Amino acid sequence: MITNPIQVSIFNAVADALPFGLDKSKVDVVEATAYSPSPIAIHDYAVGIMAAYGGVVEHLGTQRGLPDQTMSLNRRHCGLALNSGQMHFLNGYGTLMDTWPIGPDNGTYRTADDRYATMIGLHPHLRDKLLGFLDCANSAAAIGRSVQKRSSSELEEGAAAAGLALGIVRSPDEWLDHPQGAATAQRPMVELRSRGSGGTRRLREAFRRPLDGVRVVELTHLIAGPTIGKLLSEQGADVIKVQPPMGDWVLPLWLDVSWGKRNIALDIKSKSGMARLAALLADADVLVSSQRPEALARLGLDLDGLSRVNPDLIFTQVSCYIPDSPWAARRGFEQIAQSVTGVMHAHSEDLPAPTVVSVLLNDYLTGYLGAIGTIAALSAREQAGGFWTVVASLTKCAATSLSTLRPADSEPYAPASTQDLIDFAIDQASPSGVFTRLAPTVAFSHTPSYVRRATNWPGTSPDTVDWEADDAESDVPHVPSVLARNGAIRNLVPCYGIEDRGDGGGGLSLASPLLMKLVQESRQF
């Protein structure tokens, strides 16, 4: 049973948002050493949410005829999973060996009113637009000079009007006093709503795993949304990820969260592309989207449009800000969510300047919350039928994490190491080679979590691909990491996480400083 008070409180907060109860007596937690130093109890926060994920998976499984199950989690494993991209290797070499994330357009800078603002350029089109807004060159010095000419509110509002991702570093109290923070505080950790009952689609009795036969269309990008699809696939769902033929893939992150999916390229702005998407949706159980609502509405895929295509659909939406709120249409990323909600402020109180936490706290855990809501909605649909909506947001996840604050030095920390891969990693073969990655965080007593398809590249499957037969199955295709045990992981850098810094001079990266140093030293030219 979960006994840690923080883990219990988060588990209960998630359970309170669901239409049925969760039994924490079925969950066992191994209390292991943390690796991400912070006054926010990151590992315990992760355990509470991940245990709730295990609970809803078990609930739906028993509803579909599978036996009752117990679940086990390891506290350290749960925290490491919030940086799973750093623990991802192909033939022994890290897939995050890429210097793209370190541009000065991703960083935190001091403003004219002596505050800080965090900005994310990340993709080329956003970077160019951001530099145009700032009217400066793409260097930390130039961006810093431009930012120091404007007040924090001028920057935040101007960036929002321009469709850019930028947020003031607020304290937790400032966030709660802000209209957006107040609106967020009133909402549950994950939201489920029914838009009509009845319907005809129900799931058959499960063959082997809780989500056998569940069909999922994914219209997502980066981490939070794709994590939902990955988690559903680990429990047996058939996931088809739809991407535009051209775009910003951020390949290291793509590989981390594309396990278990068939990836197709589809131009849904074209008549033929939309027809193909509609055909997939008509026979789907779930649509997972991280697209902004107005973008979907322009394509005729607002709630009314989706319900016409499929009146039994579960529409899961993940975003930075909750829908129907003052900032619902604004862009946001992990670091922006940390900045505006007070997470960066709370994490940095004993540091010389605002610094984000060393894991992608909100990206991955919002993915878990979205998966929890999706599975809960599938369960509710079995009883009432109909069209359901599920909402999870980065800022709700971030703000809730502040309930776990305690002194940062209240426990010891140990850096990530090869021993972690020996303890928690698996090897899985693919056409590209052998991937080593962290195993699923929740171990079930009867139904193992696994994916039959290794991660693959954008557009690997043809756009004519169709849903699989319900009984498609195979043996567990992964094994505890042989490469790690044999010392064949070549470039794991011991570190305490991503170690992003926003120190008033820019410099946010998805890699630790030690990893980036290794990248530079290993260049051949």
Where are these regions (language model features)?
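Short, well-ordered alpha-helix to beta-strand connector turns
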Residues: 236, 260-261, 284, 333
